[in-house]
């Protein structure tokens, strides 16, 4: 049992709620005093607390009991900046609302709420996005528009987040960065309140090892549970993988993927197990994505025992995802001018170019039941020499509008697949080597007549 609440002593201090004033200093003082005294639990009395960035220390549990709501300040100057990693590159960025940085054996727990009130940052991003796209700067707007994360765990170990609700984050919900032995248990994440929040991922596991995510319910506007390891030249420089991740007993609602690997793949992603999961309205059950300048390998991904409904794909795999975001090109009018450091980082080429070619291999998806799927599968390598390798999909039942496509693969295997689809719809196959594409008992709708093998 790695729970940091064990053996840490009694409640250290109670803070009285007052939402009309900024409580950051008072809460932080209680956390710091608790840590100096050898650790323990900081308890907040029921009520609303307005706060800026808080920093949890080693040996401390911040307890958010039922009836406690932390209201994040909407003013970005209440979040001091420091060097971190954002969307795959290291740069200066505002602190999160709750931060656990360079600490051990710390936690946040309870049945309370962290309301990040992030709409001010959503609106800021959408306005900047319009301006930047018109200038050919889509690739950098996500980095120029600084927004506040909900929770950051960075360079820390033996950390637990348990039981509370996280909502309306200005940027990513919970980022686990350069850390190990972290547990996320029973969080409810809801970023679909009061607007469309860009980049409001639920949980991001970023160049970290030995991570458990369980019993979580994630409703967001980007990847629900996402696994990352840096991007492009900067990610290849850092070269730290994410590995040994277990995701179980979770529900993904609106979002881009129940489990997503990428698009930041530079340090590699390996040894991921997901089971007993549910997808309700998210875009993909499993999404793998990268780009031709990311590099790294996604491998040894296992996903089983999944129920899905109203999803776009059961599997989506793309080596060349979202080019307008993935590739950085400086418009001519900026040439020769002074540009920010993070622009230079993004514009640094990967040399030799082959170092940036990503690999996806050894992926296993089984025991999936899916209803109302737009397209069963969309899996595409890049060319003859850069294929998706060793994919195994089996024991899957899906009702789908379109079977989908499989292109540029090697040893791609589908067996015991039952699709309910229109007879005229056939799966598109192109440039696949040593593959076994076999749909058994494929049926048509609405009368469910056996249609045979849909591959051609």
Placement of each model-derived feature along the sequence:
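Glycine-rich beta-solenoid repeat tracts in large extracellular/virion proteins
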Residues: 53-56, 69, 73-74, 96-101, ...
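N-terminal extracellular ligand-recognition/capping segment immediately after the signal peptide
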Residues: 39-85, 91-94, 99, 113-114, ...
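Right-handed parallel beta-helix
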Residues: 28-35, 66-67, 96, 104-113, 116-173, 180-193, 237-239, ...
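Single conserved hydrophobic/aromatic residue that forms the stacking wall/gate
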Residues: 1-12
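Beta-rich accessory regions
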Residues: 31, 275, 292-456
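Surface-exposed acidic, glycine/proline-enriched linker/cap segments
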Residues: 79-98, 125-148, 329-355
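Acidic Gly/Asp/Thr-rich repetitive segments characteristic of extracellular carbohydrate-active
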Residues: 14-43
